[in-house]
Design a protein with these regions (language model features):
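A structural signal for short loop-to-beta-strand junctions that line the ligand-binding cleft
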Residues: 20, 98-112
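Bilobed "Venus flytrap"/periplasmic-binding protein-like clamshell domains
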Residues: 25-51, 56, 114-180
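Paired acidic/hydrophobic, glycine-rich loop segments that form the ligand-binding mouth/hinge
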Residues: 78-83, 184-189, 207-209
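Conserved phosphate-handling catalytic cores of large alpha/beta enzymes
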Residues: 213
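Conserved small/polar residues in nucleotide/adenosyl-binding loops
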Residues: 216
Length: 217
């Protein structure tokens, strides 16, 4: 809690200095889908800044990290929540930014919280990542941070996209598809505990699948 307060205060003071220096008094913050952690967290953070730094922060729902970096580079947003590995992809021009090239016009203000790669299912046959073979699995939108995290975890278990029935869905679409029985499992990358996953595990027989340490290091 103390760390969170320190981060928020540092961000608020930094933006206040911008305002005092004759800079912008209104900023747009890109977050993520409305069902995810970015949007909820961004809403609280934006309101705090608005109340304490004399800068109005307008929080908007977006497609996530890559879209936020692109919008900051284009000048449409001034702030954005971004997955740290996607930030590195942009800076280096790799993976999700390989086709369009590097973007290095942004700067990091603060690290907010750790995100967890989570694998959720309602299929009792799925007890490990290896059990995803032949299953219908949401691995995030193409080129997204979730997508590359999922590909890395699958690879560590000896699987590729071709070994599963890959579905390229957003956070909200993934949880809805699980509820409706349209997919067998989904990769979710978000701050833990994740409210949408908690709700799903509480109201259905959904559960988190263990991911071996060797799959994430």
């Amino acid at each position: 809690m103390k760390k969170m307060i320190a981060i928020v205060l540092a961000l608020a003071m930094a933006l206040a200095l911008v305002a005092c220096g004759g800079g912008a008094t209104k900023m747009t913050m890109g977050t993520g889908g409305t069902a995810g952690t970015y949007y909820a967290y961004g809403g609280v953070l934006g309101q705090y800044i608005t109340n304490n730094a004399e800068i109005e922060v307008v929080v908007v729902s977006t497609d996530g990290s890559k879209a936020n970096i692109q919008s900051i580079d284009a000048g449409d947003y001034q702030l954005g929540t971004v997955q740290s590995d996607v930030l590195a992809y942009a800076w280096e021009g790799t993976r999700s930014f390989e086709s369009e090239g590097k973007i290095d016009s942004f700067r990091v203000v603060a690290g907010l919280y750790a995100e967890a790669v989570q694998l959720i299912t309602m299929d009792p046959e799925i007890k490990s990542v290896a059990d995803l073979a032949g299953k219908s699995v949401s691995i995030g939108a193409p080129g997204s941070g979730v997508y590359f995290n999922a590909v890395d975890v699958l690879g560590a278990a000896g699987l590729t996209e071709n070994d599963i029935n890959a579905q390229y869905q957003s956070f909200a679409d993934s949880t809805d598809a699980l509820k409706d029985g349209k997919i067998d499992a989904a990769f979710i990358v978000a701050g833990a505990p994740t409210p949408a996953i908690q709700e799903l595990c509480t109201t259905t027989n959904a559960y988190l699948v263990p991911i071996d340490r060797k799959s994430v290091v």
